[in-house]
Amino acid sequence: MKVIGILPFKNEEKFLPTYLSNVQPICDEIIAVDDHSTDNSRQIMEDAGVIVKGYEDTEKLKGGWTCGLIRQHLFNYAREAGGTHFVCLDADETFTSNFVPIARDIMSQLEPGEKVHMQWLALWKSYTAYRDDHTVWSRNFKDFIVADHPDLDYSYNYMCEGRTIGPNNNDTLRTLEVEHGGVLHYQFACFNNFL
C-alpha cells in the first residue's frame, strides 16, 4: 500500500503547516498543484518535501482549466508515483486527532474503488466549536480517501462536488461516524476574515 496525499492549493500559507503536520504521518508522499500562489505557499510545501507541480505543468490541457481537471491531473501524478490509496483534503482541512492513528489500518481494509466517507466538521467562529445545528454545515459527509481502481476517473466540475475519483454510492462508500474520525474545516473558524 502506498498512500499519497493530493492537494490543489493557492495562497494557503496560513493553513499549510497544520495540514502538513496532520497529513504527513498518514501519507508516504504528497503531490500538489500550485495555482499561481503569490504568498509563501509553494516554498512551505517544497521545504516539507512535497512534490509541487505548477499550473504551467498542466496548462496545455484541452477543454480549459477547471477544478475537476486539476484533481484529475493530481490523481494521474499520484498513479504515476505508484499510489494505491489517495488522501484528498484541502489545505484548510485536517483529520480529527482520533483518526490519524487508525488511518492506515482503515485504508488497508478498503477494496479497490472503495472510499472513506467522513463527517465534514465546519469549525464555526472558533477553533473549538463546529456547527451541529441541522443546517447544510452540519451532518455533512464527504469522501476524503479512496483506494484506487484503474477504471476510475474524476468527472466532476467543481471541488465542492466531490474529492475522490469514481462514483459515490452505497457500494463504494465506507462511512465513519465521528467517534472514529472526521475532517475539520477551518475556513469559517476565523469568521472576522469575512467581515
Predicted ranges, named:
Residues 11-26:
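Short, well-formed alpha-helical segments that are part of the catalytic scaffolds
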Residues 7-9, 34:
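Short beta-strand/turn micro-motifs composed of small residues
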Residues 2-4:
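Cell-envelope/extracellular polymer assembly enzymes that use nucleotide-activated donors
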Residues 64-75, 96-195:
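Catalytic-site signature of metal-activated, phosphate-bearing donor transferases
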Residues 82-96:
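Short beta-strand-to-loop acidic/aromatic patch adjacent to the donor-nucleotide binding site
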